[in-house]
């Protein structure tokens, strides 16, 4: 005879997940320049890219070994930062060098030019130079965004763009109007006449969400939690089955 004892554990854990910028504006994953092989456009190419003769190339086009005006224009626009077509070839602009023309000769050793200032890297705020589908840009740690991680984006400190836990305040993030706490995860007030009870918002008919900030579908007085997304909570279900065997 065999018996089974199953225990279901259900837990709710507040999460403060952050979202780095790892995709370009078209939703494609950014490819780190440092991951692209130097001197190889064969089987070792990375996402079809290789650094050949000192410059970043799309291997399929580079292998044609013919000068293609369309590709040279494309290369200057997509695979370079400061470059232009000169005498039919994509060439770094004056004082610029490197495989993607992002290194500036006019700055000190180990520095480059960003805007009008010399900085250690073209990517600001510890970003990483990368290749996108439309242009060279940077992978950015939260809460930074923009082509070169130059723009503060406090929404990147939360797991969902619909959360309002943080807001921009100059060059740093502070808690949103309805939140407090070290991680801005303590609700201090609700929207749409919701009532704050034991740290949670009790929403009136027609609204739902952490702050009662979401309106139910037209014609529905109440909202099913199954159809809503709860960004501040991580639900974990652990199923533990212990089998007992009797002989």
Swiss-Prot record:
Major localisation: membrane
Presence of the UniProt keyword Hydrolase in the record: no
Glycosylation positions in this chain: 126
UniProt topology in membrane: Single-pass type I membrane protein
Cellular compartment(s): Membrane
GO biological process: one example: Notch signaling pathway
Cytoplasmic membrane side: 241-247
Molecular function GO labels: Notch binding
SMART domains xrefs: EGF
Protein name: EGF-like domain-containing protein C02B10.3
């Amino acid at each position: 005879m065999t018996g089974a004892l199953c225990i279901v554990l259900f837990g709710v854990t507040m999460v403060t997940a952050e979202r780095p910028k790892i995709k370009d504006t078209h939703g494609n994953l950014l490819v780190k320049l440092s991951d692209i092989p130097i001197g190889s456009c064969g089987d070792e190419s990375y996402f079809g890219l290789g650094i050949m003769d000192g410059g970043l190339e799309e291997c399929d086009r580079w292998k044609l070994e013919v000068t293609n005006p369309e590709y040279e224009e494309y290369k200057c626009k997509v695979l370079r930062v400061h470059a232009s077509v000169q005498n039919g070839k994509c060439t770094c602009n004056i004082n610029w060098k490197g495989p993607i023309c992002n290194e500036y000769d006019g700055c000190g050793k180990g520095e480059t030019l960003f805007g009008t200032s010399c900085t250690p890297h073209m990517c600001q705020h510890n970003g990483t130079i990368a290749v996108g589908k439309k242009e060279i840009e940077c992978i950015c740690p939260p809460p930074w965004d923009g082509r070169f991680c130059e723009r503060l984006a406090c929404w990147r400190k939360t797991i969902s763009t619909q959360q309002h836990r943080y807001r921009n305040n100059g060059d740093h993030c502070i808690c949103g109007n309805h939140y407090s706490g070290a991680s801005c995860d303590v609700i201090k007030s609700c929207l749409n006449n919701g009532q704050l009870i034991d740290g949670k918002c009790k929403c009136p008919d027609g609204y739902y969400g952490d702050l009662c900030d979401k309106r139910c579908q037209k014609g529905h007085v109440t909202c099913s939690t199954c159809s809503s997304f709860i960004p501040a909570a991580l639900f974990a279900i652990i199923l533990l089955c212990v089998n007992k065997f009797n002989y």
